[in-house]
Amino acid sequence: MAVIKRALISVSDKTGILEFAKALAEFGVEILSTGGTAKLFRDNGIPVTEVSDYTGFPEMLDGRVKTLHPKIHGGLLGRRDLPEHVTAMQAAGIPDIDMIVVNLYPFEATVARPDATLEDAIENIDIGGPAMVRSAAKNWQDVAVLTDASQYEEVLAEMRSTGGATSKATRFALSVAAFNRISNYDGAISDYLSSFNADGTRNEFPGQINGRLVKVQDLRYGENPHQQAAFYRDLYPAPGSLVTAQQLQGKELSYNNIADADAAWECVKSFDSTACVIVKHANPCGVALGATPLEAYQKAFQTDPTSAFGGIIAFNHTLDGAAAEAVSKQFVEVLIAPDYTEEALAVFKAKANVRVLKIALPVGGDSPWSRGRNSHDTKRVGSGVLIQTADNHEISAADIKVVTKKQPTPEQLEDLLFAWRVAKYVKSNAIVFCGNGMTLGVGAGQMSRVDSTRIAAIKAQNAGLSLQGSAVASDAFFPFRDGVDVLAEAGASCVIQPGGSIRDDEVIAAADEHGLVMIFTNIRHFRH
């Protein structure tokens, strides 16, 4: 145990710092501080010594040089167990500093502002703070280093139980957290500055990217039992994203549960109307809109009852008791909704293994992050990473082009836009038959588009669903007319696709021959 006798506190985020400093003062700890933090302490009656008075060297360069002094870093780096260190410090008049409490200039928050300039960013690069944190973290055997307000109460609790001391285990854990914070901070600076070109313009893909992830949990195993796995989140997760989920009940989430739950949640939250999405192996096997969650679920389940067994079910509106009763009649791995009524939760209490997740819907805004979406997607390849801007493109009726002689009715257009939205979340090659606000057949992941079309039609037939008058979405263009021939024979009346094939004329002619409506979006939604 190391008793805390002297602490240096210098924070930008002053959350909880008054209470923490008062508690230290009650232990008889001498408090050193700088600038605004010192003023805050004085104004609240907490005894404090300004760092400039302690070092005998004034702050200079608009506060850029405050703590970069041998009396500070010597007090942090000197090892108490080495006689030569102790002798040197005594000769130089350098006392020990047993604790520092430092959080850094808000660089990340500054550059996150849309109006932030390069000058703003530079002025928010902390120098003295990280230097002190590194010194203290290196000498964790003797010094406790706190870098976040969330650490205050735990440290105080230990000090209260030990008469004002911290344990070696606590100091080591604080040291690791401190180095993680410095790494993340420097990574954010590197990422931001690397994104600038020589002429001052920004580059979407900087010369170096520093991955900054935080472990959420270890997993029992990976995609298969022989693989090890863990779940990590972004340092600053988007509101309404899967990692913000609260698990209300059920077994621990598996690797596959998480992957499938993300696919279901991303799809369902793209709808404004009440919707239900059922996912199996990261592919939607049933999607529907309804006046109520119950109606949406019943319609989604009709698409493919066989595949829905053991699936992931997601809703974008509060799940009520009626919908919960219906869902509870089938085997479900994970259930997701923004909220649940008390009646719904009571239903699932009898199904203790069902993993019930609650995720608040994103607040919305101009950026993908504010809408709960990734701004970029990554994919690992051999010793490398592919990075692309995320596929967050959405279309409306104003963005489409009718390329056939026949024009869509309002009802057809509504079904086509619904089908197009679903197809975006189906693995390529993707074909989706829809009608009346629900999927009727889904063909996913085939190497040829015509095979996906045939499979989607067979799925509908197996489920006893008629495709007469249905709408079809294809995530990419039809390379030949054969896919159009198959969907027309199945009963479709209209189709939406990107267009762009060298055989577009042939494909459009086939649609005209069958009396179909065909719409081009000029946007492709490959998903691999």
Curated annotation (Swiss-Prot):
EC code(s) of this entry: 2.1.2.3, 3.5.4.10
Catalytic activity: (6R)-10-formyltetrahydrofolate + 5-amino-1-(5-phospho-beta-D-ribosyl)imidazole-4-carboxamide = 5-formamido-1-(5-phospho-D-ribosyl)imidazole-4-carboxamide + (6S)-5,6,7,8-tetrahydrofolate; IMP + H2O = 5-formamido-1-(5-phospho-D-ribosyl)imidazole-4-carboxamide
Organism ancestry: Bacteria, Pseudomonadati, Pseudomonadota, Betaproteobacteria, Nitrosomonadales
Protein name per the record: Bifunctional purine biosynthesis protein PurH
One Gene Ontology biological process: 'de novo' IMP biosynthetic process
Keyword match Hydrolase: yes
Domain remarks: The IMP cyclohydrolase activity resides in the N-terminal region.
UniProt keywords, alphabetically: Hydrolase, Multifunctional enzyme, Purine biosynthesis, Transferase
